[in-house]
């Protein structure tokens, strides 16, 4: 959903679009709630309130002020992520395909021969980090840039087994044009930047679990963040390999040698970060022209000093000369050294060439060892070739993708590796490594151990659901960790499957009720980003690959109307009720009937069940940004912080009724997951609320009316407005509450319209118009620890006779209250009041 705020209406008609006119009779929160539950994708919001826009954006729903038709067209034709704090729109707009154009935000790609392999007549355009270079395309009242690129396709091609790039690109573009936009993945780059900038301001120690290559630029500016990944491939791990021969396989049609060099250097930088938590000087020998240095500097400033007879235009200091072992004295501490020296083969005979390569490899190793032999805080990444050689057993082997699989690989060596024992590795084993192992991640840090960390803030996005992690340990970590943002896979199966297949692995599935957290927010992607100054135009969909975002230790926990709130909670219900169901009242009717309340007159106005809780349970797959457990808990301990707007607090019994309705709904849908969720929410309600039922009552509150429009033979026809189980010394407290509620009680618009047999031999009249006040007084009694109300549904009625009688229907008739009283069952009236 996207909300586009306009001061004036527009004459054009757009698909999937609705106009909403701000209702001045309602507060900003109610306007925001009504907007959030509209079922179309585009909302044109007229006469808008800035506060309403703020409320929507904090809820993760993109709401942007639009000044003219060009801005409107730009935002209505695509999806986007909105930085509402800085008024920046990040479009995810692929309409540039109509210019026969693909886009990249990696400068090095523009320096390759990739355009020779594009679709006929197509070109490649560099658009800068997150599309920053496109800002000049939009002369708007807000900052706008198009973050959409085709880098995902290019990188997927590089790691695939396909060689024909044109066919691969064509297939992926057609797929992009015929499937739903993976909005969370596109938006995630924007979110990660905001997230870690925000966390770094307030946390000295941050741990990041499971980063992948898509994050390789993000963390360059955060050397102190401790990374955990799948671990490195060590020299000693080659003992498992069988010997092989040279393969000579081409990986990419266009030259990706620069990509390999960039990944090698970035891998070395992160390895250095993990050891020393600071930025190093980057020394490079060879690898000219290294256009990718420009890409790194777009994200974070580094000092590059390079040696190569060829130009290296983006180096801070380039020496257009060869580097020799004796020159290592020029290299300072607190640095990394990348050695990529290799003479071009030219027309040299193969055997002679192999001899030269081996000599250069040994020379490279000598430079590396000489560099590491003195000083401190140093890491070296050195180019190697498959040959019989002795290597440190703890050195890290790299084989990032390159244009052709031949004889080369790379090795990271640090000070401890240099001093470690060496082992002989045969040439055939190294060929086996080169032929079969591709380094898929620039993060080669050791795996994360599932245990609580005392002073660290843990971030684990899409990293802990894999079934090689112990599920109970994942839950334990989330329950115990004081400060963290962790995601787990949402169980949106219908058979309550504990695992779901994903690519070539399995993920554990989770529900919010699996966690016993305190001071944490459990929400969706859009609910989470709202807390970090972002909103999104396309909300989470039940794709089967959805994740719960769990934030521990957030200062926004008690702000239930601002973040991870109830915005959009009825949207799925509206989509069904106003399109597919038997009546738009279907939800109200079902909730009453499933709780044995058969008086459906005015059910849409006076419903006996919390619609919020009911919708949050049965449609949890569609809207899990609303943190239901947090909402329940904060109400139970009376710590709700409401910023503004009219607010209705549910009685705990309303929540129980909602769970009962949700369970019956789940059974009818054969939805085992929702059935478990509803049962667990009901247990949670009973856990946090101390609900005691007056199933053996000794007092009741009665309402006597001036007149009853039916014949009766009971002594005093009255409405039993709830029963109590109290001691006599609590009577003054009950009377005090009745006096406190007197105005509201007498203001009730009570009506009746028919009679019916409540059970055998009990003829009663229906009563409408009292439930809202009943639940309100229930809450007051609950907070005063006075036992009020029974475990069965409260069905308002007036007993007329203890004989069997026919049903009578009359016009809706208002009943005027004569008095309200407290009376002992089978005893005397102890209190009465009149208007």
Swiss-Prot record:
Q: Which CDD domains match?
A: capping_2-OMTase_Rotavirus
Residue ranges for the region (GTase/RTPase activity) are 556-692
Which reactions fall under this protein's catalytic activity? a 5'-end diphospho-ribonucleoside in mRNA + GTP + H(+) = a 5'-end (5'-triphosphoguanosine)-ribonucleoside in mRNA + diphosphate; a 5'-end (5'-triphosphoguanosine)-ribonucleoside in mRNA + S-adenosyl-L-methionine = a 5'-end (N(7)-methyl 5'-triphosphoguanosine)-ribonucleoside in mRNA + S-adenosyl-L-homocysteine; 5'-triphosphoadenylyl-(2'->5')-adenylyl-(2'->5')-adenosine + 2 H2O = 2 AMP + ATP + 2 H(+)
Active-site residues from the entry: 718 (for 2'-5'-phosphodiesterase activity), 720 (for 2'-5'-phosphodiesterase activity), 797 (for 2'-5'-phosphodiesterase activity), 799 (for 2'-5'-phosphodiesterase activity)
| Protein's UniProt keywords contain tRNA processing | no
Q: Which GO terms describe its biological process?
A: symbiont-mediated suppression of host innate immune response; viral process
The UniProt similarity line reads: Belongs to the rotavirus VP3 family.
Comment text on domains:
Contains a bipartite N7-methyltransferase domain, a 2'-O-methyltransferase domain and a GTase/RTPase domain. The C-terminus contains a phosphodiesterase domain that degrades the 5'-triphosphorylated, 2'-5' linked adenylate oligomers produced by the host cell in response to IFN stimulation.
Name under which the protein is recorded: Protein VP3
| Native source species | Rotavirus A (isolate RVA/Equine/United Kingdom/L338/1988/G13P12[18])
